[in-house]
Each structure stands twice: as structure tokens, then as C-alpha cells.
Amino acid sequence: MCGRISQYREATRYAQHLGLTDPFMLFDAVDRRPGYNLSPGTHPLAIFPGEALRAIHWGYCPDWARAQNLPQTINARAETAASTRYFKDLWHTGRVLVPADGWFEWRLEAAPPDQHSDADADEPPAAAAQPVRQPYYVRLKRDEPMYLAALSNVRGTEPQTEGMGLVIVTATADVGLIDVHDRRPLVFTPEAARRWLDPALAAPEIEHLARHACVPAARFMWYRVSPDVDRPLVDEARLIEALQ
């Protein structure tokens, strides 16, 4: 899945790298600051057809789902989004991109040994320590921006009301990409990302992008980072630095 991203570069850098010719910034640059630990409920930048960039709530719940008191969702599966009630309309009319510099994953690992134990060597060994949930940061080896496929029901400059927002599309993880679970964000190169934004793209082409255009695992690197990333209110550059 994708539940935490970094998006710390200037918006103009994402636009230039993507090859936008006339980007339209629909946000106040004065109020924007680098995001190293963006979680659902925050407002990452999204890129829309027409080259507009806008800060969008991460989380989505259509009106019919809200009426049934169903929870908002933050991800959509690439394999099923085109046919599920939550996302089938957005799949064709609400494709956007979330520019990112990396994302976080967690996996259970053995707890580090206690280097300061004063236990008597003659005492029986204590029970094995519980595994810890270790965060990892995943980024491109070339440390360039990446573009996450996303869906949104926000249009133009209309106000965002309850239930409106975006979801990040996930795909099956490659063999070799950090062995956490079987999902990862659907990450595009700039060329594939521009095609994803094309509102005239036919359904078979959308499906082809979702199934075959994901950046392969060999182009990524990942490493352990501070467990402070578990705290959504902590948003500092040190969170994407490798642990010694």
C-alpha cells in the first residue's frame, strides 16, 4: 500500500521534470513548505490535466458511501479500480498525479540486542524480544522526482468539501522491491505520467499503463530510517536520512 510519502522539492521542479510547458499553480507558494512525512489527511500537491498543480486532501469518500457511514479510503488497487463502485468513474475522468520524492514502508524485524543488559550469565535466557516495526524509505537511485498515479473527484478551482480528495493507486510489488507486503505505489516515468493525465486516453490504454508502465524495482533503493516517522506530526528532513 502507500500510506506515507515525501514531497519536499519545489513545485516548479516537479513541473519542469515532468515536461510541463505552462504549469498553473493553484496554491499559495508562501504557505507551502517541504513535506518529508505526508500522511493521509494532509494536502499533498497533485497535478491535473491542463497542467494545473493544486494541494488536495489525501482521502476520498463518495457521497453514496458517506450516506452509508463508510470510511474514506486512501488507496485504489490498479487491478480493480476500473470496476469498483468507489473508483470506476474516477478511473476514466479523475486521473491525476501526485509528484513525490519517495515513500515509506514498514516491516517487522527482530529487535536489536540489548547492549546494556546486566543479567546474570547463570540465569536462564529471557523470552525472545518482540519484533519491531522498522520503517524504510524508498526512493529512485538517481534521486529524481517520481510520479504516483492517483484518482481525484476534485475539479478545477472548486472548493473542496467533505468527502472530496484523492487516492493513490497501488500495484502488485515487484520481486526484489523491499520485502514488506505485496503492494506498492503505481510509479510512472515522466513519459508514462503525461499519458496518464491525457483525458482522451481510451480504456485499453489506461489499463496498459496500469499493468505495464510501473517503474521497475531495479531503479529504486531503500534503507532504514528513524522510527520517528511513525509520528505523523513529525515532519523533518532527518526522517528520510539513513540510520547509521
What is each model feature region?
Residues 1-244:
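Short linear sequence motif anchored by a di-proline
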